């Protein structure tokens, strides 16, 4: 879809892995409000099994330990279908949206249909959806393989979007989420939380710390 991606500036996250891409825009700040983190999990029965329950459990545990946990409200939706995504965005008006599941690169993200089988949602459709909710959402995390394509598109509308530039293993995905949300719920910035998430992968000896990528609008 149209323009805005070619002038991105990529800055490497020194010593801790990861890379950050900047786009031009303005971030909306909403200080003093309780932030809602919405987790959308999908693992269609026709796809390989993921450890989504462990990932969400670690996110929740990090939130409970956090110094500023009272500033965050965690909402979860499982086996998500297309209608579950937009309905959850309408119902909860989250500031952070976290997708856990499978990605298909240029094909899109893999949600579930009415029978639990895989339904692909295109990059363009996702970008347009998040554009509609851009006034509330500050950060989107796509913890799915090959989701950098979607992250680039969504980052035209959302201040911070994290995707994966290749396949990512379950353990690395869980470690990244653990570090990211531990930092975020301690009051750190999204960029710091991203860097810590990458570093936690590295600290655990997993050679995938460069897989998560952060796309930014400034």
Question: Where does each model-flagged region fall?
Answer:
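Caspase-like (clan CD) cysteine peptidase catalytic core
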Residues: 112-145
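Short, surface-exposed amphipathic charged segments that create phosphate/polyanion-binding patches used
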Residues: 8, 91-92, 176-178
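A domain-level signal for caspase-like cysteine endopeptidase catalytic cores
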Residues: 28-123
């Amino acid at each position: 879809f149209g323009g805005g991606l070619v002038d991105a500036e990529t800055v490497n996250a020194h010593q801790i892995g990861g890379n950050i891409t900047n786009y031009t825009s303005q971030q909306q700040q909403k200080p003093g409000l309780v932030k809602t983190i919405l987790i959308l999990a999908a693992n269609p029965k026709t796809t390989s099994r993921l450890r989504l329950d462990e990932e969400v459990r670690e996110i929740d545990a990090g939130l409970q330990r956090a110094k500023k946990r009272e500033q965050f409200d965690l909402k979860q939706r499982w086996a998500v279908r297309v209608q579950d995504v937009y309905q959850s965005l309408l119902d909860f008006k989250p500031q952070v949206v976290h997708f856990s599941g499978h990605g298909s690169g240029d094909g899109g993200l893999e949600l579930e249909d009415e029978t639990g089988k895989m339904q692909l949602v295109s990059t363009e459709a996702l970008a347009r959806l998040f554009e509609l909710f851009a006034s509330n959402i500050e950060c989107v995390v796509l913890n799915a393989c090959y989701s950098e394509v979607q992250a680039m598109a969504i980052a035209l509308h959302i201040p911070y979007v994290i995707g994966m530039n290749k396949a990512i293993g379950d353990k690395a995905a869980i470690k990244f989420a653990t570090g990211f949300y531990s930092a975020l719920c301690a009051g750190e910035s999204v960029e710091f939380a991203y860097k810590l998430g990458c570093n936690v992968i590295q600290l655990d000896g997993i050679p995938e710390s460069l897989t998560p990528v952060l796309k930014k609008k400034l």
